Amino acid sequence: MAMFGFPHWQLKSTSTESGVVAPDERLPFAQTAVMGVQHAVAMFGATVLMPILMGLDPNLSILMSGIGTLLFFFITGGRVPSYLGSSAAFVGVVIAATGFNGQGINPNISIALGGIIACGLVYTVIGLVVMKIGTRWIERLMPPVVTGAVVMAIGLNLAPIAVKSVSASAFDSWMAVMTVLCIGLVAVFTRGMIQRLLILVGLIVACLLYGVMTNVLGLGKAVDFTLVSHAAWFGLPHFSTPAFNGQAMMLIAPVAVILVAENLGHLKAVAGMTGRNMDPYMGRAFVGDGLATMLSGSVGGSGVTTYAENIGVMAVTKVYSTLVFVAAAVIAMLLGFSPKFGALIHTIPAAVIGGASIVVFGLIAVAGARIWVQNRVDLSQNGNLIMVAVTLVLGAGDFALTLGGFTLGGIGTATFGAILLNALLSRKLVDVPPPEVVHQEP
């Protein structure tokens, strides 16, 4: 098949249970639509939760995730099976840049959007460079020890935000604990797709419990469904205009480094599952993701990234057809044009969102450790040990550096600190040949 241009998508006659469906193959229309629904559901939990945590409109973010996925599909020539959803990497820096308190709509959303656009631009430029010279320089700049440390630092940096969001009252704190337990029980005691959707299912169960305890038993603030009943079934989401603030852009733009590392890992995972070489499309994937992030930020949506949740669905179903993600994108766009759906999202109690964020932020931190384990990172080397130790404290302590009028927050200092310390302290192990033994004749 040609390196660039769209494949022909040969019809796969076997069922999804008995055979693998390759990226350049397709299922019958009905099965493609059903698989699209499954992928839309898989991305739903995080794509809704992340914009809420940043004070963005989740309805618009869902719409832009669908549009971004279609843009990614066209830029990669329909060769890379991936779904683009709201990225957790933006949460900490957006909150730091805007001073968002975690409740309702972010009043400083405009400067956050300018930063998201700047991040997408940096990401796109990196993709263009990769298209020219390949990815080896990225792997040298950000080896697994660096990416693992930065990802873990992001999770630790977000931890105080999650805890503070559920500390308003004793009832909120206990409901957050109940939410954590709901998600944990789903993760451990369910199987198949329900287990894959642990965040979404856990949120639904926790919301039902919250409704019973407040609306029925009167133990807390009741859930108000007035907005849901008055909202229209179809309509435009709320768009916002970006503002370009230098300090916010400097704070948010470095997230591009995290997105590159994340996308790189996801593409390698997809390549391993499909048996296809994804390296020729890596630069295009970065460009597609970067442009989708810029487009989303330009109208009020969150930054996007390829989703591990959907990679997990592919691993289970063995269906890698890229047309499935077109179906998922169309479904997401339809949901994004439903104000009633958006109003329903806004009824999720803050305590439940806070409990879910405790789990999500913890999983982000653990994902960093998983990178180390999967790549057999040697933390007994002093260079690696010092780099990781400093990076984690910079991120967890939200260490900031100010230069002139610009301030680099904890995630930014952790990211650049990890890259710089790795470059300074890493050393290649050189095999020293054993001394030559000279045998003298007696």
UniProtKB/Swiss-Prot annotation:
Segments crossing the lipid bilayer: 58-78, 80-100, 111-131, 141-161, 170-190, 197-217, 241-261, 285-305, 319-339, 348-368, 386-406, 407-427
Lipid bilayer topology: Multi-pass membrane protein
Gene Ontology BP annotations: pyrimidine nucleobase transmembrane transport; uracil catabolic process; uracil import across plasma membrane
Keywords, in A-Z order: Cell inner membrane, Cell membrane, Membrane, Symport, Transmembrane, Transmembrane helix, Transport
Pfam families: Xan_ur_permease
Top-level division of the source organism's lineage: Bacteria
GO molecular function, one term: pyrimidine nucleotide transmembrane transporter activity
Localization terms from the record: Cell inner membrane
Primary localization class, coarse: membrane
Database matches in InterPro entries: NCS2, Pyrimidine_permease_RutG_pred, Xan_ur_permease
Consequences of knocking out this gene: Cells lacking this gene fail to grow on the nucleobase uracil as the sole nitrogen source but use the nucleoside uridine normally.
Gene Ontology, cellular component aspect: plasma membrane
Induction: Up-regulated by the nitrogen regulatory protein C (NtrC also called GlnG) and repressed by RutR.
Keyword Protease attached: no
Periplasmic side stretches: 79, 132-140, 191-196, 262-284, 340-347
Cytoplasmic side stretches: 1-57, 101-110, 162-169, 218-240, 306-318, 369-385, 428-442
Function of the protein: May function as a proton-driven pyrimidine uptake system.
Family, per entry: Belongs to the nucleobase:cation symporter-2 (NCS2) (TC 2.A.40) family.
Misc. remarks from the entry: The Rut pathway degrades exogenous pyrimidines as the sole nitrogen source at room temperature but not at 37 degrees Celsius, a restriction that is apparently a consequence of an inadequate ability to remove toxic malonic semialdehyde at the higher temperature (RutE/YdfG function).
Name used for this protein in its record: Putative pyrimidine permease RutG
Organism the protein comes from: Escherichia coli (strain K12)
Gene behind this protein: rutG
